């Protein structure tokens, strides 16, 4: 669904384990990392879309997760011009997202990335709640910051884990050896 302003309705999914670490997944074709996300169909609510996308992208059903909360309103980002398909009608210039925070209550082996013919992701790991802000592609960074900051009090009631508000996180190089992040 693309609205009259050119934004595609979408859900973003933050899956948090019992240690308050979040599922971070590597896209199969681009080798970029991100949270699972996906479009909202005309016939479904954002909550229904969130559950459907969880199952399609990481193989988790309602028995594996519990909704903790979601953002109060749509969070928008514009696509860089090189990603806009100007020949498509209606024209999509970006995404508007409702973000859901889920508690993972399943087992590690329940995460299945290969349930579709074209999997979205080829690898996943648990990372610190704030880690994605340093690693996400630049044009999604502000939306990630807003979603993580809005949802953080639901799992960090004392707010001690909130980072200082900064709109421009510096890009960091990936280390060649991977340690627990």
From Swiss-Prot:
EC numbers for this chain: 3.6.1.-
Motif Nudix box: positions: 38-59
InterPro entries: Nudix_hydrolase (IPR020476), NUDIX_hydrolase-like_dom_sf (IPR015797), NUDIX_hydrolase_CS (IPR020084), NUDIX_hydrolase_dom (IPR000086), RppH (IPR022927)
PROSITE patterns registered for this protein in UniProt: NUDIX, NUDIX_BOX
Keyword terms of this UniProt record: Hydrolase
GO molecular function, one term: pyrophosphatase activity
Ranges where the Nudix hydrolase domain occurs: 6-149
Pfam family, one: NUDIX
Required cofactor(s): a divalent metal cation
Entries under PANTHER family matching the protein: ADP-RIBOSE PYROPHOSPHATASE (PTHR43736), DIHYDRONEOPTERIN TRIPHOSPHATE DIPHOSPHATASE (PTHR43736:SF1)
Chain's role: Accelerates the degradation of transcripts by removing pyrophosphate from the 5'-end of triphosphorylated RNA, leading to a more labile monophosphorylated state that can stimulate subsequent ribonuclease cleavage.
Family stated for the protein in its record: Belongs to the Nudix hydrolase family. RppH subfamily.
Protein name: RNA pyrophosphohydrolase
Organism field: Nitrosococcus oceani (strain ATCC 19707 / BCRC 17464 / JCM 30415 / NCIMB 11848 / C-107)
């Amino acid at each position: 669904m693309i609205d009259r302003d050119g934004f595609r309705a979408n859900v973003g999914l933050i899956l948090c384990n019992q240690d308050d670490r979040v599922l971070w997944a590597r896209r199969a074709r681009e080798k970029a990392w991100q949270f699972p996300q996906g479009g909202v169909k005309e016939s479904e609510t954002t909550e229904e879309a969130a559950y459907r996308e969880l199952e399609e992208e990481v193989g988790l059903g309602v028995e594996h997760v519990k909704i903790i909360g979601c953002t109060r309103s749509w969070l928008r980002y514009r696509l860089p011009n090189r990603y806009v398909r100007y020949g498509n009608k209606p024209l999509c210039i970006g995404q508007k997202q409702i973000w859901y925070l889920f508690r993972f209550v399943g087992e590690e082996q329940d995460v299945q990335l290969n349930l579709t013919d074209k999997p979205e992701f080829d690898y996943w790991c648990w990372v610190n709640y704030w880690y994605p802000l340093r690693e996400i592609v630049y044009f999604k960074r502000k939306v990630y910051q807003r979603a993580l900051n809005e949802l953080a009090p639901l799992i960090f009631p004392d707010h001690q884990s909130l980072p200082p508000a900064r709109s421009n996180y510096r890009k960091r190089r990936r280390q060649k050896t991977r340690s627990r992040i």
